[in-house]
C-alpha cells in the first residue's frame, strides 16, 4: 500500500496546503476509510518501563495533537500512539503558513508552536476510550505565555494520569521561545523533580505508576548530553526520547523552503538523531529505556535505530511521504530481520551498532 500511496495518494494530498492535508488525513482516520492489515509477530513484542508493547513502532507526537484518532492509529499497526503536545489552555500556535514540505529531501519544516485545543478537549476524547486496550501516551507541554512553565507540565501529569499509559515531557520543541532552556542542568533538575513528584503523588492515590519520558533535542553538545544523562539517572527517569526536530539544515538537496525557520524532520534528521541516540545510550548504560525518533521511513531505518540503542522507535514525517501502509511494511521488515539475524526477539538486536554510531561526526 505504501507504493500505491506514493504513486496516487500523495500526489492528491500534496495538491493541498500541508496543514489542510494533515486535516484531511485525520478526517480519513476518523471515518475509518483508512485501514491497513498488519502482521502480529510475538518476536516483535517489547517490554519497556513496565509496559508490554506489541511491537516497537510508535506514532510520534505532533500528528494527533488533540487526541482525535489514537485508536485508528493503532489499527494501522503501530504498537503505541502518542497524542499531543497538549498544553493546559488552548492556543493557536504561530501564524500560518507554518508547515513546509521539502519534497526532494522527504523532509518537513514546521514552526507550529504547540497549537492545540488544550487539556479539557483532549481529556474528554481520551475519557471516551477509557478501558480500551492499546498503549496511548500523552505528550505534555507548556503554554507560550505561562508564568510558571513547570507548573503546566505538572498540570498535564495530574489531568491525564488516569488516562495516559505513559507521559512524555516535551522541552525540546524549537518553536516555543525559551523552551529548550529547560534542558539545562539546573532547570532540568527542578522540572523533573516537580513532575516526578506529581507523578508519584498521583500514583500513590491509585496504585498505578505511569512512566515518564523526557524528549530531547538533537542539537545538544556532548556536555549537555552528559548533564541530561546524569540528571535522568539521579531522578530515576523512566526513559528518554531522542529526538525532536533539528535547527540544522545540513545535507539538504533543495534550497526551496530550507531557509524557513522552524524544526526540520524527516529523512535528513536520521543521521543526526541516530548519532545522538547512540551517544545517549553510551551515557545512560543498558538499563534506561531509549526511544529513537527522526528520519524513520523504512524497516532499514527503524532497525538501524534499534541497533544504535533504541528500545522503541517512533515516526511521523515518514507517514507523510510513504502513507498508511508504512507501519505494516516496517513491521514485516523487522520480522524478516529477526529471522535473518538468527535471534528470537527484536530486543536482542538492540545496541549491535551503538559504538559505531556514537563515533560518527556530526556536521552542524
From Swiss-Prot:
Broad enzyme group: oxidoreductase
Substrates-to-products reaction catalysed: (S)-dihydroorotate + a quinone = orotate + a quinol
Chain residues that bind substrate: 65, 110-114, 170, 175, 244-245
GO CC aspect terms: cytoplasm; plasma membrane
Entry keyword Aminoacyl-tRNA synthetase: no
UniProt-listed CDD domains: DHOD_2_like (cd04738)
Obligatory cofactor(s): FMN
GO biological-process terms attached to the record: 'de novo' pyrimidine nucleobase biosynthetic process; 'de novo' UMP biosynthetic process
EC number: 1.3.5.2
Cofactor: binding comment: Binds 1 FMN per subunit.
Family the UniProt entry places it in: Belongs to the dihydroorotate dehydrogenase family. Type 2 subfamily.
Quaternary structure (record): Monomer.
Annotated function: Catalyzes the conversion of dihydroorotate to orotate with quinone as electron acceptor.
Protein's recorded name: Dihydroorotate dehydrogenase (quinone)
Taxonomic lineage of the native organism: Bacteria, Pseudomonadati, Pseudomonadota, Alphaproteobacteria, Hyphomicrobiales
Amino acid at each position: 500500500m505504501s507504493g500505491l500511496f506514493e504513486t496516487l495518494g500523495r500526489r492528491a494530498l500534496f495538491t493541498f496546503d500541508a496543514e489542510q492535508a494533515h486535516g484531511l488525513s485525520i478526517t480519513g482516520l476518523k471515518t475509518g476509510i483508512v485501514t491497513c492489515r498488519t502482521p502480529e509477530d510475538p518476536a516483535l513484542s517489547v517490554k519497556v518501563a513496565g509496559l508490554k508493547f506489541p511491537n516497537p513502532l510508535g506514532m510520534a507526537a505532533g500528528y494527533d495533537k488533540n487526541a482525535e484518532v489514537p485508536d485508528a492509529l493503532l489499527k494501522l499497526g503501530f504498537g503505541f500512539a502518542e497524542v499531543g503536545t497538549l498544553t493546559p489552555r488552548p492556543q493557536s500556535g504561530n501564524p500560518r503558513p507554518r508547515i513546509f514540505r521539502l519534497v526532494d529531501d522527504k523532509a518537513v519544516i514546521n514552526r507550529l508552536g504547540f497549537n492545540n485545543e488544550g487539556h479539557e478537549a483532549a481529556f474528554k476524547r481520551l475519557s471516551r476510550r477509557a478501558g480500551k486496550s492499546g498503549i496511548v501516551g500523552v505528550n505534555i507541554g507548556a503554554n507560550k505565555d505561562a508564568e510558571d512553565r513547570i507548573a503546566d507540565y505538572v498540570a498535564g501529569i495530574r489531568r491525564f494520569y488516569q488516562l495516559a499509559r505513559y507521559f512524555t515531557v516535551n522541552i525540546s520543541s524549537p518553536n516555543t521561545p525559551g523552551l529548550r532552556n529547560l534542558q539545562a542542568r539546573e532547570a532540568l533538575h527542578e522540572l523533573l523533580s516537580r513532575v516526578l513528584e506529581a507523578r508519584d503523588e498521583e500514583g500513590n492515590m491509585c496504585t498505578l505508576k505511569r512512566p515518564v519520558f523526557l524528549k530531547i533535542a538533537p542539537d545538544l553538545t556532548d556536555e549537555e548530553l552528559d548533564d541530561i544523562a546524569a540528571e535522568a539517572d539521579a531522578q530515576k527517569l523512566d526513559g528518554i526520547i531522542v529526538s525532536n526536530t533539528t535547527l540544522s539544515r545540513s545535507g539538504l538537496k533543495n534550497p526551496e523552503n530550507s531557509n524557513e525557520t522552524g524544526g526540520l524532520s524527516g529523512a535528513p534528521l536520521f543521521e543526526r538523531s541516530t548519532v545522538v541516540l547512540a551517544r545517549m545510550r553510551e551515557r545512560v548504560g543498558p538499563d534506561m529505556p531509549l526511544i529513537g525518533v527522526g528520519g524513520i521511513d523504512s524497516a532499514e531505518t527503524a532497525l538501524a535505530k534499534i541497533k544504535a540503542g533504541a528500545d522503541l522507535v517512533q515516526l511521523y514525517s515518514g507517514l507523510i511521504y510513504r502513507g498508511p501502509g508504512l507501519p505494516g511494511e516496517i513491521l514485516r521488515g523487522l520480522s524478516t530481520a529477526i529471522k535473518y539475524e538468527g535471534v528470537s526477539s527484536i530486543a536482542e538486536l538492540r545496541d549491535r551498532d551503538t559504538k559505531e554510531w556514537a563515533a560518527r561526526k556530526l556536521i552542524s
